[in-house]
Curated annotation (Swiss-Prot):
The gene is thiM. This is Hydroxyethylthiazole kinase. It catalyses: 5-(2-hydroxyethyl)-4-methylthiazole + ATP = 4-methyl-5-(2-phosphooxyethyl)-thiazole + ADP + H(+). Catalyzes the phosphorylation of the hydroxyl group of 4-methyl-5-beta-hydroxyethylthiazole (THZ). Keywords: ATP-binding, Kinase, Magnesium, Metal-binding, Nucleotide-binding, Thiamine biosynthesis, Transferase. Pathway: Cofactor biosynthesis; thiamine diphosphate biosynthesis; 4-methyl-5-(2-phosphoethyl)-thiazole from 5-(2-hydroxyethyl)-4-methylthiazole: step 1/1. The lineage of its organism: Bacteria, Bacillati, Bacillota, Bacilli, Bacillales. It comes from Staphylococcus epidermidis (strain ATCC 35984 / DSM 28319 / BCRC 17069 / CCUG 31568 / BM 3577 / RP62A).
Amino acid sequence: MNNLERLRSENPLVICYTNDVVKNFTANGLLSLGASPAMSEAPEEAEDFTRMASALLINIGTLTRENEEDIIKIGKIANQQGTPIVFDPVAVGASTYRKNFCQRFLGEVNVTVIKGNASEILTLIDFNTTMKGTDSDSELDSVNIAKKAANTLNTAIVITGKDDIIAKNEKIIKLSNGSPLLTKITGAGCLLGGVLASFLFRNTQPSIDLLVEAVSVYNIAAEFAEQAPHVNGPGTFLSELLDQLYQMNDITYKNQVKKVEI
């Protein structure tokens, strides 16, 4: 049984502590793929949920003073339960507040995968970095940033951009699937975090090949969505992306994946 078949057979429970802007899209995307999202944010039930969950997604897009302690508490409970965590440090370089929170979070919680654009990941290893928001910086050296971040933070790194870079231990892989329309809808990167979590299967040390498959399945679905005859902009693309995630299969993944080890 391949990983995508396993995902659809097991319907892994993924706890999505994500931002308010993308909750609906993230939930629908994971359901389309075959996972079972739970949008629970109450620390009072975190122990029960993480015990059952395949993984926990933490996305700080709408971080506030009111929820920061809950995020850290839920992360620590996931660590105690052996539940892998995908961390998405949205716009970490945009404010001192976000930088300080991420520095504290990564000091107190062990994460399995960190996903972000090059600017966000660079900020995590150099908190003097500044950025304008969630947009990526195409001029940054994503390969070296990913390599340094994987070593410094001792975790798997996924850097998104025109090409995606995955680094784990000393291995680095560049992926070249995807669609420019992903940058025209809100929550595309946030959903990818959920897709990564869906592929973890309670494994806190996933192989880089598993991460490659998770990212590529999503990006290939985006390519197919863009190519659909009725898609003529972001609105039709968004709904078609859900359909393509639903229709994705292992043969399509293997035939379409564009990857190279660096």
